[in-house]
Design a protein with these regions (language model features):
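A structural boundary/capping signal
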Residues: 2-205
Length: 205
């Protein structure tokens, strides 16, 4: 386990373990976090000011193909945390990290799996019954079942300015370039978090 909570607190002073977090909640009733937002009319990744990852312009390098075989690298959790902080901003969101270290996979490996073996994007969108959070939770399950130890989870975020909406997608750490990408499970697009337009609320890995 690469992550020591005392060392982590030196980098991120607001770090809590689960017991410390639960101790700060009300003792006589649960703390309920409820989604009270409207979902966007189209996935936010399709906005003009969003940087999509272009796999045609960035083909899989030969070095990444070589890394697809053999033992995978073990990534310290602090690397993932620092990459998330760099991508989303320094704070004002909750980040739940369940593991002290992760197994390193690349964006090209994940894209190959999603493109060839996953069909979450073909599911029908049904308000309330199967909407954005359901899409992201289903894809998270499929990906984590296939790529053991992958730093792949779910993020909830919304706009910094009106009109207000909220959205849930997947979040992924690509170890080959030490970078965070969001993954829209409704259309399989990989994109960067737009810190100028959006604010993160919660991330769960």
């Amino acid at each position: 386990m690469f992550l020591n909570i005392d060392e982590l607190k030196k980098v991120a002073p607001n770090t809590l373990n689960l017991d410390e977090y639960a101790s700060g909640l009300k003792a006589d009733e649960p703390t309920i976090i409820f989604r009270d937002y409207n979902e966007p009319t189209e996935p936010p990744c399709m906005a003009k000011d969003v940087t999509l990852f272009d796999f045609d312009k960035n083909p899989r390098p030969e070095t990444d193909l070589a890394n697809a075989y053999g033992i995978k690298p073990n990534i310290p959790g602090i690397n993932v945390i620092n990459a998330i902080r760099g991508a989303l901003g320094p704070g004002n969101y909750a980040l739940h990290i369940a593991d002290g270290s992760y197994t390193g996979y690349s964006i090209w490996e994940l894209n190959e799996f999603i493109r060839n073996f996953d069909q979450t994007n073909l599911r029908t969108y049904v308000p309330e019954a199967f909407d954005c959070d359901d899409f992201s939770q289903v894809l998270q399950g499929y990906v984590n079942a296939f790529f053991l130890g992958i730093a792949f989870g779910t993020i909830w975020y919304g706009p910094r300015n009106p009109p207000n909406w909220g959205h849930s997608v997947n979040i992924f750490y690509s170890y080959t370039n030490n970078k965070i990408y969001l993954v829209e499970p409704q259309n399989d697009r990989f994109y960067e978090f737009n810190k100028n337009a959006w604010k993160a609320w919660m991330v769960i890995l």
